[in-house]
Amino acid sequence: MVEHATGSFSLTVLGSDGSYPGPGGACSGYLVRAGTHCTWLEAGPGTLANLQLYVPLEQLDAAVVSHSHADHRSDLESLYVALRYFVGRERFPVYVPEGVLEELRGEHFGSTFDWRVVSEGQSALLGPARWTWRRTDHPVETLAARAEMSGRALGYSADTGPAWELAELGEGLTLALVEASLARAAEGTVQHLSARQAGAAAARAGAQRLVLTHIAPGLDRESAREEAEAAFGAPVELAAVGRTWEI
C-alpha cells in the first residue's frame, strides 16, 4: 500500500482498455486520492483487483460510476460480495446516474451500498474534493466529472462522442483524462472519440495536461498519442495500469 500526504491530489490508473479488456488488461478504473480520501472512479472489469494493490477495501471511501455499460460498472458486483461477506461494511457510498440503478435492478445489494444518484450539473463533496457531473454525448445517460481540490482540477470525459465539449467541465483543468476509443478512420461511426478528437477537445478546454484513456485493444497506442499531440499542441500521455499523476 502507498502512503498519501494530507494535501496530495492524485490519479492512479487501475484499468484503461476501451470497451473490453485486452490480454492481461482491465477496463476503465481509476483511484482518485484527495488527501487521505480514496475514491474508486469507474468499476470496469479487472479494476477491483488492481485497486487493492493501493488501498484496502476497509479504507476505500466511495465509488463513482459514469454510466451503465458493463465495461464501466461490472466490478461493483464483486465489490458488493467483498464488502457484504468478507469485509463487513454497510452503507458504502456509490455515486451513479439513474441508469446504473435501472441496469442493476434485479440485483439484491441490501444495505451494503448507499446509492447516491447524481445527474447533470449536480455537485457533491467527496472528502476534501468537490465533484461536479455533466452529461455527455453517449447512447445512455453518461456523466463526465470534474474533481477539484485546493485550486487543482481533474477533468474526466467518461464515454462521449464529439457533440459534447470537455470545456463544459469548466476552466482551469490541471489534468484532463479523455477517452480515445476510435481510430481516426472510424470517427463519426459511434458516440466515442478518436485520439485526434480528444486532443482537440482538451485544447479547446484549455487543459494543462492530457492523458488518453479507453483506447481499444488492438489500436496503435503510439499513433494515437501522436495524433492527440498534434491536435492538443503539447505532449500527451497514455493511461496504463499503475501509472500515477499528481494533479
Q: Residues of each region from the PLM?
A:
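Catalytic core of the metallo-beta-lactamase
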Residues: R116-G172
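Short beta-strand scaffold segments in enzyme catalytic cores
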Residues: S28-V32, L143-A147, W245
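Active-site neighborhood of phospho(di)ester-bond hydrolases with catalytic His/Asp-centered motifs
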Residues: W40-G44, D61-D71, L154-A158, A176-E179, ...
